[in-house]
Every structure is written in C-alpha cells, then in structure tokens.
Amino acid sequence: MSFAEKITGLLARPNQQDPIGPEQPWYLKYGSRLLGIVAAFFAILFGLWNVFSILTLNVSCLVAGIIQMVAGFVVMLLEAPCCFVCFEQVNVIADKVDSKPLYFRAGLYIAMAIPPIILCFGLASLFGSGLILGTGVVYGMMALGKKASADDMRAAAQQTFGGNTPAQTNDRAGIVNNAQPFSFTGAVGTDSNV
C-alpha cells in the first residue's frame, strides 16, 4: 500500500461516494479536506482567543470570536463528521452538503470567514478565518474545473466571429489602412516652435 493510498484511506469517510468526481487529482480532493480540518481547528482556537478580548471590553472582537468559533465547528462538522460521533444527525448534514455542487461549499466557507475579519481585524481572526477563506478558495477553484488542453485553447483562439474568413496574421496588417510610419527626421512644417 503506497503512502498516497494510506492518506486517502485516512481522510475518506466510510461508504463515501466520490462527490467531487474522478476528474480532480487525489491530492486536491483530500488536500482540501485536510486544509479544512486544520482551518477548523485553528479557527476554533483563535476564536477562543478572540472571546477572551471581553477582558478588555472589546465587544466587536467578542462577537467576531464567537462567529469564528461557530464557523470552525461548522467546517469541522462538514469536513470531518467523525469528530462529532455524539450527535446522530451529523452524517446526514454532511452527506447533504456533499451532494451539493462544490461552489456551494466554497461560497459557504467564504461567507463564514469574512465577518470575523471585518469585525476584529487582528492576527487571531486573520489567521483563523483566513484558513477557512483559503479552504473556500480551494473549493472554488475545484468547482471551476481543470484548464482545457492546449489544442482546445488554440482552436478556441483561432475561431472567427462573423464569417469563415481566417484572421490576418500578416506583420503588415494594421488597424488603420494607409497609415504612415512614424518619422523622427525633423519638425513638421506647420510647427510654431512654441
């Protein structure tokens, strides 16, 4: 058993279908899940740190810390439902979100990560929610899909709109017909030398 198979076996849930699809590489599928788990852990940890800002009577950082901790728990619930074995409905919720398109998860993570950063801009909220934001960006990139092959992009670039005439690739083809080249030999005869 290779190292990659061991890692994928650790991160896969039992009886899990492949919601992302076979077109994504294994390191992107499981790397995004691992990034989400790490992001959730640090969001909970730094959210707790922000909650302790109540000692300095900073209410906005208290609210940001609570939101960040809730976001961390939601991300942990969706990425690693095995951490919440005491709740019966966790697998149902995680399976429901897994059945949705990837851009749904990306939007959810990005929307949960932005308010703590806005409410209390500091290293704790920036790092904790920034990791969740990064996880949302990775899921968004996975939702966009992979880039087309070079031949497909070349064919799309050579298509012309409005006819079957091929595009001009001549070096002398210009935007303006009968345009004269620039000349730096002297001043124009009507120049007033002002």
Curated annotation (Swiss-Prot):
Q: Which residues bear the site annotation Calcium ion selectivity?
A: E79
Molecular function via GO: calcium channel activity; identical protein binding
Superkingdom in the source lineage = Eukaryota
Which compartments is it annotated to reside in? Cell membrane; Cytoplasmic vesicle, Secretory vesicle, Synaptic vesicle membrane; Presynaptic cell membrane; Endosome
Q: Which Pfam families match?
A: Cg6151-P
- Quaternary form? Homomultimer. Associates with the dally/ magu complex.
What does the protein in this record do?
Transmembrane protein which mediates synaptic endocytosis, fitness-based cell culling, neuronal culling, morphogen gradient scaling, and calcium transport. Regulates synaptic endocytosis and hence couples exo- with endocytosis. Controls two major modes of synaptic vesicle (SV) endocytosis in the synaptic boutons of neuromuscular junctions (NMJs); Ca(2+) channel-independent Clathrin-mediated endocytosis (CME) in response to mild stimulation, and Ca(2+) channel-dependent activity-dependent bulk endocytosis (ADBE) in response to strong stimulation.
Q: By what name is this protein known?
A: Calcium channel flower
Gene transcribed to yield this protein: flower
